[in-house]
Amino acid sequence: MPFKTSPVFHIFDQQHQEAKLLFLALGKQVKSKKAIELQLKLEFLELFADLMEKIDFESQNQGNDLFSPFKSLKKALRKTHHLKLVEGNLKSREEDSGLLYDSYRAYLLVQKRKIQKEAFELAVGSSLKIWDDFREKALLASRGIKPLTINTAINQLVQEELESIHKELKSPIHSQGFRDLFESLRKIIMLENLLIQLGFNPIFVNSIHDEIAQLKENLKPWYSNHLAFQTLSGFLAEKTSISKKYMEWIKELKEEKKSLSSEIEKQAFSFLNKILV
C-alpha cells in the first residue's frame, strides 16, 4: 500500500540529490569550492541521520548506521576546507606585509596535494550504491513520522546541544572548547532552519536567533586564526633555523588568538546567561 512521504524526507531528498551531484564531480577533479559545498551538504545529511536516531528510540545507533559510509569522506573534505582557510590567511599576510613566504607556500602545496589525493581516492573508491542505500534507508526511517514527532525530536536535539555547551564551556575556554562551541551553534542553526522549512515556529525569538548566528559568525576569524597558527607552527617545527619574518608572524598570530579568544569568551557566556535563565 502506498504511504505518504514525510515532509522532512522531501528536504533530505533535495539535499541528498545535490550532494550526490557534487560527489560525482569530485570523482573527476577535486576542487576546493566543490569540496566545501559537498562538506556542507554532508553536514545536513548527518544531522538528518541524527534526527532519525532521536525519533527511533528502539534503535539508538540508527543515525550512525545511516551516515557511517560517509564519515571518512566528510573528514577528508573538512581537511580541504581547513587548508583553504589557511591559504586565505597566507594570502592576507602577504598582501598586508608586502613580504613573500615562498617556503611556507610550497609546504602548503604539498599538504594540499596530499589532502586532495585522499579525497579523490575516497570518491573514486566509493560505489554510488552507498548513496542509493542511504536514500532508501532514510525513506524507510522517515515513513509514517508525524509532524509533532519531528518537532519534538528537533527541540530535543537543540536542547541537548545547549546543555552540552553549558556543561562543557568553562572559563578559560580552550581551543577544543571553541571548536565544540562552533559545532554546536552550527547544528542549532541548521535545526532551527529545518523547523522553519517544515512550517513550525522557531524555538528562539528573532533576537536570540540573531545572537546565535552572530556568535557563530564571530567564531570564524578565531577558527581561521587557530588553523593558521597550528599549521604554521607545524611548518616551523621542521626548521633548524627560523627567519625573522616567520617569528614575527607566529607571534602576531598568537597575540591575535589571545585577543579573539577573550572577546568570544565574553560573548559566549553572555549568550549562555540569556538562553539558560
Residue map of PLM features:
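Function-determining surface determinants
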Residues: 1-277
